[in-house]
């Protein structure tokens, strides 16, 4: 079953975080038609969804298996960087650059910082 979740990535990007009523209501409505139909696993098709994996599991049912492709994406990125000879310079120091497809406003940057780094 393919299920379009048109609003979900945007909700995550706009700080509708785990366990909020808005997120729970959206997921409940989205997943209700598929509960108790014999579906045993859900494959997350977006890198955003890993942040709400537990919410999806709770909305669908505790027994469902959840698979995400994030580890595979990271492994592939690492492989490509190694193939191209691209590595972090030893004198680069600490820090991060966040590139995204939405907005560069301060609210979004704070949201990403909270999602990725917990602060």
Model regions and ranges:
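Non-catalytic structural scaffold of enzyme domains
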Residues: 1-119
């Amino acid at each position: 079953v393919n299920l379009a979740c048109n609003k979900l990535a945007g909700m995550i990007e706009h700080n509708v975080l785990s366990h909020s009523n808005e997120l729970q209501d959206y997921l409940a409505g989205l997943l209700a038609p598929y509960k108790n139909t014999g579906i045993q696993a859900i494959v997350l098709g977006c890198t955003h969804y890993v942040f709400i994996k537990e919410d999806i599991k709770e909305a669908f049912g505790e027994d469902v298996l959840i698979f995400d492709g994030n580890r595979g994406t990271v492994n592939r990125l690492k492989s490509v960087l190694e193939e191209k000879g691209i590595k972090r310079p030893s004198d680069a120091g600490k820090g991060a650059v966040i590139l995204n497809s939405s907005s560069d406003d301060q609210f979004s940057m704070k949201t990403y910082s909270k999602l990725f780094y917990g602060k």
